Curated annotation (Swiss-Prot):
Matching PANTHER family: FYVE AND COILED-COIL DOMAIN-CONTAINING PROTEIN 1
Record PROSITE patterns: GOLD, RUN, ZF_FYVE
Protein name: FYVE and coiled-coil domain-containing protein 1
Zn finger spans (FYVE-type): 1132-1190
UniProt function note: May mediate microtubule plus end-directed vesicle transport.
InterPro entries documented for this protein: FYVE_FYCO1, GOLD_dom, GOLD_dom_sf, Run_dom, Run_dom_sf, RUN_FYCO1, Znf_FYVE, Znf_FYVE-rel
Residues annotated as domain GOLD: 1296-1425
Subcellular localization: Cytoplasmic vesicle, Autophagosome; Endosome; Lysosome
Length: 1437
């Protein structure tokens, strides 16, 4: 019944969970907004899921006794899964969570936010081994149907978005029941983002591949993995190079776009300048056209005057006709007078006509640009000076206008040339842009190749994973009891050593606390001393007051009563003020002394801590150097031994070759000796045969000689008796004798030849015998040498074997010692490697930033140079225009002066004409009188008729000229009269204005006279008053001398007192500032020390947990080894067949045992040997163990040869191999993020690697909640994202806003423009604690200002950004980021920058140190404000 009730309850809970999931999906679809903590369905879902996760769970506890929950189950299942462990890393990074239950709840919320809860639970349920280890049989997770139903229902939540706050709730107590306001809906996933360890996708892939490849390559030394590693390294390098090239191309494109925009702006500016210059040229041309039109108008006026002259001539002719018709009544005298007057008039008219003609001719010549011929100039009369000046002025104006026109044309031509050049530059830029487009097109196939490489890398990765899986399966079968016991013993010793080091650090901290208490006591003693000094100063102040009171009474006796009262009041006020000020100063002094004491104590404590840290760092560096030296010496010894072994082998081979050569030479010599002996025997036989023949011939010769003698004797006896009978016989005998003699001679010759041959053969024999003796001696020497070489070889082999044994023993000892030392110093080595990688990354970033700054500076310099050229051109044009304006003004002034001169000349001419008019009127009156007296003069007329007739002809001739001259003069006078009248009008207006001004000046003079009179009266009064004052002054001079002496004395004393007070005040201010700074630094350092202490405590707990887990592993391994030993070690009689070849054992086929696994095999399968111990001894094993050890050690020798010297033993445990792989990974990791941390922590990926490399151990869960501080100190604007988080990243602008909203503010300094303007030349200090940021706000009320800054930081770099806020009430979401957060190398160089104010508001300068968890920064900054220079045209006249 109980079981059925629990099953029904479980089914009801599962149905409720499914209903809650469907309600959440419906709520999201209907509302369209993310689910928050306010949702009741979410509360229901959380409780139901937690109930299922805790249902029928096995009770487990950690080493410290804390209960384990489903969080530890998640860690055990997902610690090795790439991507799924991001949530585990994030939850471990939250320091607020203390219990396993709270961490599990945070992990479920993380999975909901990232929409991967169903995938995570499915991965956990698929690991049936771990699930059965954590849950009993009644759990629904062990039932496939129920677990599949739960996961299938949870997959509906993958499409639902959740907006849950990552922090701010007490998840250890309960689930959240209300929604806390987050930064933004888009930043929720960003806040849930786990700490990243890489800066780009390629580095992320490379780091992951390195973690997989390093373990396999260092543990197993497999050639396949080495090839895969090389290919992966090459692909990673190609990927990095392609990324760098793509970035360079993008930067180049952007730079070319900026240059193109700048050139377009330049072209537009120069086009505007050209337009202005063209307008100027058009104005000059219009002026010249106006002058030409003026000349044309003058010509028209001349034509009009000629027409009027013609009209006057016609009128005169009509008058002459009328005069002819009249009777000749006047007398001859009157006619003569009239003739004289007409002559004078004709002469004047002729002169004027000549002047007009010359002027017209000169004007025509000036227009045509020709000169007057010399013959006409000779006949002309002198022209008046005013007309010459006027003509020269007109000519000069024309020339100036022509010069300006030519200058304008030249400027136009230059501008057109500039435009052509700019057009060419634009064309070049367009061509460059086209080339860039081609380059971009070329990048496309490279990207395709890159994608292909990525696919190949994925295939290689799969192959690598398969090989790793195979290797892990092989490693599980490589366990040996003694070796693993030894490994666990070593690990135990390492853990004990780490525990002792941690206890030693705790003792150091306790000693530091004791030093701090000692410093506090010292500070109290200093406080007492300062109190004594304060008492002494108060006594001195009392003495000064007494002195002031002593000097006071004699002065008061001499002063009048009123002055004495005033002085008493002032003394009372001063005394009260001075007492109050002294009390305040004493209080401030006391406070400052206390604070100074505290700060000095803290400073000394920090200095001692710093010295201790420096000593520790020096000791670590020394130990590291010693370890490196030992490793180098070991490597050197190994190399020497290998070299000596190779040399011995080579010498042995060379000796063998020499022995073979000597043996071949000996054999050849022996064959030669045998051949020579055979030849000598043959020669000996031939000599013996020839000697026998010679003897036989000698016998025959002697016989024949005897016969001859006998015959000769017989012949002599018979010669007497028978001379004739024996003559024939005698001839025959003589012939025979000759024949025999010839044969004997021949035989003698042959004997001589044979003797010579015999001698030669005997010589050859002697030679051969000597050579044979030499060869035998050489052979004996060679045999002895060979024997010696064999003995030496055997001795060398024995010595080499002994050396190898000694080296192997030494190597084993050194390896053990190096392992111990390396494991001791491993953590410090990692820290140093991390710092090295950080310094390298920071140096690379600094180089990149320096290059970018140089490019920006170069572009700014080019822009400023171009602007300077434009400004110079504009100033030159301005100067030219000013000169032109000045010349025009001068010409206008000259024309005005010339007009005045002309006006004067015209006035004179008008006066002359009036006089001539009066004379003509008198003459007309005289003519009328003469006409009245005409009757009396008829006689004279008759006499004068002849003269008149004679003169009439001349008069007719001269009349025409006079008429023309008169008409021209009349028109000229009329024009001059008109101009004179106009100028007179202008002069009248000017005279009226001057009269008004004179009237105003007269009124002002009258007012001044009135004021003068009043001033004279006042002066009289003041003079009388001065006389009285002088009298009083004389009386008071004596008093003032007395007072002055007393004042001087008191002033000196006061100056001394004020100088001392000022000195004390300055010292106090300095001490206040120093103590504030020291307070801030000490608080930050204390905070840092507390954090490190807390971290070390957590690390100690983690190490204890790891130690417990390792003990559990060792116990499980021992148990498994015992079981395997019991299973494998079978009796000899129980096994009847060989395990390898299945051959039946008999009395011929014997049984053999494997020295590793205990299997039994036959004689035919026993030819397998493997090295399993550091001593290098080979042991017989079965075929399966030989294959396992052969693959593990990378040996290809089937005959059982051992591993080479210098390689690690194949039976090294995974726990020993993992630190090496981790260290190498730390060395090879290039893209470690820049960091200020001085600690290095084992990350989760490294723990996963250790677990993968040590997969032969039983899979028991371990708690490794350590977190890498490198990941927590990354920049907020970093683009390093895992592939799962790229879609949850907000815009780059939100990082600064998020910092302002949720970051911890250290200091906020509000400033105004006036305060920045009065900043001074020095720098100010700003303190930024670790994990905080400081803020400088500058309020700007007017646009156009330029704010500049220079800052540096100490001891490390800092991040900087600028944000704009319209008003203080403006929400932070509406702020604008002007300069995004950038990491500046301000600890190496000064960082400069400026900002042009476009909109009035508040500009926030942010110094961000949130990326640094342990190190506080000091920022020295300097601010300036530049106002814009506005040109008001004051340079023009």
């Amino acid at each position: 019944m109980a079981s059925s009730s629990t099953e029904t309850q479980l089914q009801r809970i599962i149905r409720d969970l499914q209903d809650a999931a469907t309600e959440l999906s419906h709520e999201f679809k209907e509302g369209g907004e993310p689910i928050t903590d306010d949702s009741t369905s979410l509360h229901k879902f959380s409780y139901k899921l937690e109930y299922l996760l805790q249902f029928d769970q096995k009770e487990k506890a950690s080493l410290l006794g804390s209960k384990k929950d489903y969080w530890d189950y998640f860690c055990a299942c997902l610690a090795k899964v790439k991507g799924a462990n991001d949530g585990i890393r994030f939850v471990r990074s939250i320091s607020e969570l203390r219990t396993s239950l709270g961490k599990g709840r945070a992990f479920i919320r993380y999975s909901l936010v990232h929409q991967r809860l169903a995938d995570t639970l499915q991965q956990c349920f698929m690991n049936t081994k771990v699930t059965s280890d954590w849950y009993y049989a009644r759990s629904p997770f062990l039932k496939p149907k129920l677990s599949s139903d739960i996961v299938g229902q949870l997959y509906e939540l993958t499409e639902v978005q959740f907006d849950l706050a990552p922090r701010g709730y007490d998840l250890d107590a309960a689930w959240p029941t209300f929604a806390r306001r987050t930064l933004a809906t888009s930043t929720s996933a960003y806040m849930w983002k786990p700490p990243s360890r890489s800066s780009s996708m390629s580095s992320l892939v490379s780091n992951y591949l390195q973690t997989q490849e390093m373990a396999s390559s260092l543990d197993l030394n497999c050639s396949l993995n080495n090839e895969a590693l090389e290919s992966f390294d090459e692909m990673r390098l190609e990927l990095d190079q392609l990324e760098v090239r793509e970035k360079q191309l993008q930067e180049r494109v952007q730079q070319l776009d900026r240059e193109n925009q700048a050139l377009r702006m330049l072209v537009s500016r120069q086009g505007g300048q050209l337009q202005v210059e063209k307008e100027m040229g058009y104005l000059a041309v219009e002026d010249s056209i106006g002058l030409v039109s003026l000349v044309a108008e003058l010509q028209k006026q001349g034509d009009v005057s000629q027409a009027t002259v013609k009209k006057l001539q016609s009128c005169l002719q009509a008058l002459e006709l009328n005069v002819d018709k009249k009777e000749y009544s006047p007398s001859a005298l009157q006619l003569e007078n009239m003739a004289k007057e007409l002559d004078t008039v004709r002469g004047s008219l002729g002169r004027e006509n000549q002047l007009l003609a010359s002027l017209s001719e000169r004007l025509a010549r000036a227009e045509k640009g020709e000169k007057t011929p010399p013959d006409t100039e000779l006949h002309q009369e002198p022209v008046p000076a005013d007309l010459v000046l006027k003509f020269q002025e007109l000519k000069g104006k024309l020339q100036a206008l022509e010069g300006e026109n030519t200058e304008a044309q030249e400027l136009n031509r230059q501008q057109s040339i500039k435009l052509e050049q700019l057009a060419k530059e634009l064309q070049l830029k367009e061509e460059a842009r086209a080339s860039l487009a081609h380059l971009v097109k070329d990048v496309v196939p490279l990207q395709e190749e890159l994608s292909g490489k990525k696919q190949e890398s994925a295939q290689l990765r799969r192959q690598l994973q398969e090989s790793l899986a195979h290797l892990s399966s092989v490693e599980e079968e490589l366990a040996e009891a003694r070796q693993q016991e030894k490994q666990h013993r070593e690990e135990k010793q390492l853990l004990e050593q780490e525990a002792t080091s941690l206890t030693w650090q705790l003792q150091l901290l306790e000693t530091q606390l004791g030093q701090v208490s000692q410093l506090v006591s010292d500070l109290e003693e200093q406080k007492k001393q300062l109190m004594q000094e304060r008492d002494h100063l108060s006594q001195r102040v009392g003495t000064l007051e007494q002195l002031a009171e002593v000097h006071g009474p004699p002065q008061s006796a001499e002063m009048p009563e009123k002055r004495q009262q005033c002085l008493r009041e002032e003394q009372v006020n001063n005394s009260t003020v001075s007492e109050a000020e002294q009390e305040e100063l004493q209080k401030e002094l006391q406070n400052m002394v206390d604070r100074n004491q505290l700060l000095e104590g803290k400073l000394q404590a920090l200095q001692t801590d710093y010295k201790a840290l420096q000593q520790r760092e020096a000791a670590i560096q020394g130990s590291l150097a010693s370890l490196e030296a030992e490793q180098a010496s070991i490597r050197h010894l190994g190399n020497q031994m290998e070299a000596s072994l190779l040399a011995v082998k080579k010498a042995k081979e060379t000796m063998k070759a020499q022995v073979a050569e000597k043996e071949a030479a000996l054999q050849s010599k022996e064959s030669e000796c045998q051949r020579l002996q055979e030849e000598a025997d043959q020669c000996r036989l031939q000599a013996e045969a020839q000697a026998q023949e010679l003897r036989a011939l000698e016998n025959q010769c002697q016989q024949q000689i005897q016969l001859i003698e006998v015959l000769s004797a017989e012949k002599g006896q018979q010669g007497l008796s028978l001379p004739q009978v024996n003559t024939d016989q005698l001839a025959l005998s003589q012939a025979q004798l000759e024949i025999h003699q010839g044969e004997a001679q021949r035989l003698q010759n042959e004997v001589v030849d044979l003797q010579a041959k015999l001698q030669v053969a005997l010589g050859d024999r002697d030679k051969l015998q000597s050579q044979l003796g030499v060869a035998e001696t050489v052979l004996r020497e060679h045999k002895t040498l060979v024997q010696q070489l064999k003995e030496q070889n055997e001795a060398l082999n024995r010595a080499h074997v002994q050396e190898l044994l000694q080296c192997s023993e030494r190597e084993g000892i050194l390896q053990e010692e190096s392992i111990y030392k390396a494991q001791k110093q491993e953590q410090e080595l990692r820290a140093l490697q991390a710092e090295l990688s950080q310094v390298r990354c920071s140096s690379e970033g600094a180089h990149l930033e320096h290059a970018e700054l140089q490019d920006q500076l170069h572009r700014a310099n080019t822009d400023t140079a171009e602007l300077g050229i434009q400004v110079c051109a504009l100033t030159a044009e301005k100067d030219r225009m000013e000169e032109a304006l000045a010349s025009l003004a001068q010409e206008l002034q000259d024309s005005k002066e010339a007009a005045l001169q002309e006006r004067k000349g015209l006035e004179l001419q008008v006066m002359q004409l009036q006089q001539e008019k009066e004379k003509l009127q008198e003459k007309v009156k005289a003519a009328e009188e003469a006409a009245s007296s005409f009757s009396g003069l008829q006689a004279q007329l008759a006499q004068a008729e002849q003269l008149a007739q004679s003169l009439q002809e001349t008069a007719h001739q001269e009349q025409d000229a006079l008429k023309f001259q008169l008409s021209a003069e009349i028109m000229d006078h009329q024009n001059r009269l008109k101009t004179a009248n106009e100028e007179c009008g202008h002069l009248r207006a000017q005279l009226e204005e001057q009269g008004q001004q004179l009237q105003m000046t007269k009124e002002a003079v009258q007012e001044l006279e009135i004021t003068k009179a009043a001033m004279e009266e006042k002066l009289n009064c003041t003079s009388s008053h001065l006389a009285e004052c002088q009298a009083t002054l004389l009386r008071k001079d004596e008093e003032s001398t007395m007072l002055q002496t007393s004042l001087e004395r008191t002033q000196k004393e006061l100056e001394k007192a004020t100088s001392k007070i000022q000195e004390y005040y300055n010292k106090l201010c300095q001490e206040v500032t120093n103590r504030e700074r020291n307070d801030q630094k000490m608080l930050a350092d204390l905070d840092d020390l507390n954090r490190t202490k807390k971290y070390l405590e957590e690390r100690l707990i983690e190490l204890l947990r790891d130690k417990d887990a390792l003990w559990q592993k060792s116990d499980a391994l021992e148990f498994q080894q015992k079981l395997s030993a019991e299973e494998k070690c079978l009796g000899d009689m129980e096994v009847n067949h060989c395990h390898d070849c299945k051959r039946e054992f008999s009395w011929i086929v014997r049984r053999h045992h494997c020295r590793i696994c205990g299997r039994i095999f036959c004689y035919y399968c026993c030819n397998n040997y493997v090295v399993t111990k550091p001593s290098g001894k080979k042991e017989r094993c079965c075929r399966a163990c030989f294959q396992k050890f052969g693959e593990g050690s990378g040996s290809n020798d089937s005959s059982g040869s051992g591993t080479s010297q210098g390689e690690p033993s194949p039976m090294v445990s995974p726990a020993e191999a993992s630190p090496q792989s981790i260290g190498s990974q730390g060395i090879n990791s290039v893209c470690r993020p820049p960091d200020d941390a001085v600690f290095d922590i084992i990350t989760d990926e490294e723990l996963c690697q250790i677990q993968e490399s040590g997969s032969s151990l039983p899979e028991t869960p371990t708690e490794t909640d350590s977190m890498d501080p490198n990941t927590a100190e990354q920049d907020t604007t970093s683009n390093s994202l895992t592939p799962e988080d790229t879609e949850d990243v907000p815009m780059g602008q939100d990082a600064e806003i998020c910092l302002l909203k949720s970051g911890e503010l250290m200091i906020k300094l509000p400033l105004t423009v006036e305060e920045v303007a009065s900043f001074g030349e020095g720098s100010r200090e700003l303190f930024v604690r670790s994990s905080t940021y400081s803020l400088i706000t500058i309020t700007v009320a007017e646009p156009g200002l330029t704010i500049s800054w220079v800052f540096s930081s100490d001891p490390k770099s800092i991040s900087f950004s600028v944000v704009f806020q319209e008003t203080e009430d403006t929400p932070l979401d509406q702020c604008k980021v002007l300069i995004p957060t950038t990491r500046c190398n301000s600890h190496k160089e000064n960082i400069r920058g400026q900002l042009k104010v476009r909109i009035p508001g508040i500009y926030l300068l942010i110094f961000d140190n949130t990326f640094s968890r342990f190190i506080s920064k000091k920022v020295l900054y300097h601010l300036t404000v530049d106002r814009p220079v506005i040109y008001d045209g004051s340079d023009f006249p």
